[in-house]
């Protein structure tokens, strides 16, 4: 009998090992794909909701959102907006039935440079969750990590007790500003940073530890832990399991079902790479960023400037596609009469 736990441990999947020192989050709108991996939390974005909303399995939710938009009435544009907010919340509510933790729901990326509009939309999403019987403690509102988005996050946290997840984070400047704003969680991207370096430099492949996305998250994690910031660091946007393993020990990692599946089948030994203890010995100095300093430092990072604007454009394009899809479903019959 005494040998069995050792044997069991030897066969433990990389996913189960990872869960021992990092909170694992599922990055998907397809909530039927969540069960197998037993994540703590889940994240969604406009692109993931758009993909899920086109699956046959989720048409009832789409119909419910459409009915809600129509019931509230008003101009066509208003009905669509209400239907989309409702759809995001319906997906979030279903996801919450399958996880013990929190779900992240994103504010429309087209509001990324309008602080007040982001605050208003976030409050509306929380209101819709409340109508569905879900406490704001189980929701993270995702906002773009523009200066305006970060200030919206600060206001939502301080004045409304709404927890925020700052997304599309590519630069150290963005991470520092988020820490100073006191938001609940940040999502520094890994894979999209790698994509940029592969596309814009001569180097086309990287070992995980040398991956520029991995190095970015490592630096941010070390900075937060060295200076005692409470904001959770959640690495996001992975291209392979090597990147994930190289960030083992990070507070949270949000991972697609495809890569969660690969980790589940992988039995290689995993050890934490990031740690609070190691962060204390890093040579990072503390900095303060007001708006001018933030804009300057962020603009110095060509990759981050390009990937932030590219990310906003992509999420905005998918929001528009979702609007068109709902417009067609809601009004094409009426318009055809």
From Swiss-Prot:
Record bears the keyword Cytoplasm: yes
Subcellular localization: Nucleus; Cytoplasm
InterPro entries: Aldolase_TIM, TAL/FSA, Transaldolase_1, Transaldolase_AS
SUPFAM superfamilies membership: Aldolase (SSF51569)
Pfam families linked: TAL_FSA
GO biological process assignments: carbohydrate metabolic process; pentose-phosphate shunt; pentose-phosphate shunt, non-oxidative branch
UniProt modified residues of type Phosphoserine: 237, 256
Annotated signal peptide: none
Principal EC category: transferase
CDD domains reported for this sequence: Transaldolase_TalAB (cd00957)
Residue positions of the active site: 142
Keywords: Acetylation, Cytoplasm, Nucleus, Pentose shunt, Phosphoprotein, Schiff base, Transferase
List of residues that carry N6-acetyllysine: 115, 219, 269, 286, 321
Coiled-coil boundaries: none
Motif stretch (Nuclear localization signal): 1-10
GO molecular function annotations of the record: identical protein binding; transaldolase activity
Family the entry assigns: Belongs to the transaldolase family. Type 1 subfamily.
Domain statement: The first 10 amino acids are essential for nuclear localization.
Protein name as it appears in the record: Transaldolase
